[in-house]
Amino acid sequence: GRARGKNPNMGSNDERENTLNQLLTEMDGFETNSGVIILAATNRADILDSALLRAGRFDRQIYVDLPELKDREDIFKVHVKPLKLAEDVDISFLAKQTPGFSGADIANVANEAALIAARKDKNAVEKQDFLDAIDRIVGGLENRNKVIKVNEKKTIAYHEAGHATVSWLLQHAHPLLKVTIVPRGKALGAAWYLPQERQITTKEQLLDQMCSVLGGRAAEELTFGQISTGAQNDLEKATKQAYAMVTIFGMSEKIGNLSYYDSSGQSDFSFTKPYSEKTAELIDSEVKELVENAYTQAKALLKQHQEQHKQVAELLLEREV
């Protein structure tokens, strides 16, 4: 049901288009009194062909969003019913720890917590088992046996402490949940946040989030006078967010209130940008300025609170958590 392209070079009689045309024909061919109701589901409604959504076809749409706090509580109650829970398990607390989780994710948390408790020969599933299960699903399997050199471990500790310190000091950054230097999956360390479930996000909130993301690299440069490849994922996040701010949300003074986001799904068939080369250069310049400003702010905050940053890093190294 993907939207048909307007590019003449794509060919108008490919199999996908034939299938779509046949589907449209079949939907138009039912008798009005036949009592046939057609249901369909997709997670990419934005790229469906407009002919599918016209009156008499898929003309009623129900948007099913990810569960919110109360919904997650109810889903948790369903999935923990078969489990024997310890007294310290608080369902509302678990719901608060899992923003952005789908129903399947929550079922996975309950199953994983039960497995963790069983491995430790416990009589009941405890609160810590659920927290360990959430960590495993979010960050991957813990790998304490991974060989990491002393100087590398120190770099990781100061990097993660940088994220923690900067996000703690920023008004609009997501609240810090946990920071670790224990390798999980491909990550050598991680700082996890508890995103607030907002319906809209302001420019100040986005800038603070970007500053928090760059706190790790800023900490490396300030502490050791050099930078490493450990910030690759952070840089990717910051760059994507900056491009979104400039090209989608119209948050750049020089570009103005323009959005180059194509919600029709037609852009996949087009090889041209909807703006000139001069504008492309201006976008790149604005993105670079946003990222550099956030990085400068992160360094300034860490320089100002150097002692606290050091305390967090040394605590991570000491306890190896």
Show where each model-derived region lies.
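Alpha-helical membrane and juxtamembrane elements of multi-pass inner-membrane transport
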Residues: 14-21, 46, 92, 204, ...
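Conserved catalytic/switch belt of AAA+ P-loop NTPases
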Residues: 1-60
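Residue-level signature of catalytic and energy-coupling elements of molecular machines
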Residues: 23, 42, 58, 72, ...
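Generic recognition of well-ordered alpha-helical segments
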Residues: 22-25, 74, 78, 96, ...
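Conserved C-terminal "switch" segment of AAA+ ATPases
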Residues: 31-37, 50-51, 64-131, 136, ...
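Flexible beta-alpha connector loops of hexameric P-loop NTPases
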Residues: 1-18, 61-69, 83, 100, ...
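Soluble catalytic regions of large protease machineries
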Residues: 151, 155-158, 164-321
